[in-house]
């Protein structure tokens, strides 16, 4: 399966999200982790929280209300299925749906990026306002 096909699956997943930000605007974000072509985990934004979210947000003086972002939820789910040393073989896909046909920028926030680095995920592919982008996390930054 090609990366764009995986990202399209995550776009469909994002549509299922009903997370609402404090501003009242819906933010539909989905994330999936793949190890090669093997699907490991998927998640959507949630009004729930998790101790890991509190940890990363407090280090970065981030949101006062630590909502569980799709990226973090996918990492938490994957950590129950694979050993942390295997995250170095994974790619994180993130999509933000704006409406039925459009996507928006889904680059992970600072708190999620800290988790991505800590778990050693080397590649992130996410939607942008005009398509998609890929980021590679260098070894010294993980």
Language-model-detected regions and their locations in the chain:
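Zinc-dependent deaminase catalytic domain
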Residues: 1-142
């Amino acid at each position: 399966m090609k990366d764009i096909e995986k990202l399209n699956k995550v776009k469909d997943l994002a549509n299922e999200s009903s997370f609402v930000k404090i501003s009242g605007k819906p933010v539909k974000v989905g994330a999936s982790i793949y190890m090669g072509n093997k699907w490991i985990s998927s998640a959507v934004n949630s009004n729930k929280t998790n101790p890991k979210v509190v940890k990363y947000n407090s280090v970065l003086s981030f949101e006062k209300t630590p909502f569980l972002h799709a990226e973090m939820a996918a990492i938490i789910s994957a950590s129950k299925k694979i050993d942390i040393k295997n995250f170095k073989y994974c790619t994180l896909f993130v999509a933000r749906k704006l409406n039925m046909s459009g996507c928006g920028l889904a680059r992970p926030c600072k708190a999620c990026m800290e988790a991505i680095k800590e778990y050693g995920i080397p590649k992130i592919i996410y939607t942008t306002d005009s398509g998609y982008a890929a980021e590679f996390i260098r070894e010294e930054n993980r």
